[in-house]
């Protein structure tokens, strides 16, 4: 055995053997993510969780609307009010001072007995955060099960509430997918879409094993009992954190239900302008540094191992003997097959489509885009958590 090992070292050198070992280890890390961790999302079934109640509960949908959002009036609110579910209500908290807009909301409210409306003034001197508005919305709601969404998002189905409500049979926190939709299908927009898909995939991969750290802002909920147990949202002066840091305080190993169904999905409109999208991602991603170490490590490890794997493969092709070059190329191809197949299955489960053929573009550029997003703070990022 010693002679064989010495022969290998003499033939390939210590550096060559070390590089080969590094490639194999990094390959193993990548296979763990795409072959095991992310596959859990595709294989997850809510029915595997034990029911805690025997029937779906009444639902209060709560949404905070800031300013004069005409699209909310003409498209989004009718979709919410048109949900096919026996017992639900829509609670709208309007943040603004436009009386005509508020009167239009009142007119709609008068036509729907299951719509509630509250107004919060706000202005240049007094900025009302979303969490402050949601606190008011929760107090106005009449039901125990609360479901949150945002302007700019539309349910994919008239049965959205019905399917999300099934989660409350099995948990007090309910999380469902939300996908980003851009104005066109250019390569730039595909990369942006895949960056958001990867973030959602990471979150769902943790949520299905009871390690919830994030939920889409447009598609999550919890019970009033949990809310009251914390005396409401924390960090009220900060306009972010309600869908991640606050949920991390609420979540336990047994109280989260993940609903993965095309009917439970929500579609969020995104700007196709690069600078606006990057600013959006930076702002809502600025809570990341407050995540626990295990969560941050899970997210970073895939990205770092991917970059190092690519770098090691390039070095191997450049300097190693032919047989090791071929071995490195074979591992790279095998990894990519696993990555694309896993991503295809997970994308279908989360409501994404047309991923496989162009996935190599994101596979190569994704870490660079994430670095660009994380290399600077949003102009609106809060400096102090209070």
Predicted ranges, named:
Residues 1-53:
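N-terminal membrane-anchoring/stem segments of glycan-assembly enzymes
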Residues 71, 151-166:
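Acidic donor-binding/catalytic loop of UDP-sugar-dependent glycosyltransferases
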Residues 77-87:
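Short, acidic, metal-binding catalytic loop of nucleotide-sugar glycosyltransferases
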Residues 94-105, 121-122, 153-154:
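A conserved acidic beta->alpha catalytic loop
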Residues 118-129, 133, 137, 143, ...:
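Long helical/loop segments within the catalytic core of UDP-sugar-dependent glycosyltransferases
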Residues 146:
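Short aromatic/hydrophobic "clamp" motif used to bind/position activated sugar donors
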Residues 174-199, 228, 234-298:
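Catalytic donor/gating beta->alpha subdomain of glycosyltransferases that bind UDP-sugars
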Residues 306-382:
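Membrane-embedded multi-pass helical conduit in multi-pass membrane proteins
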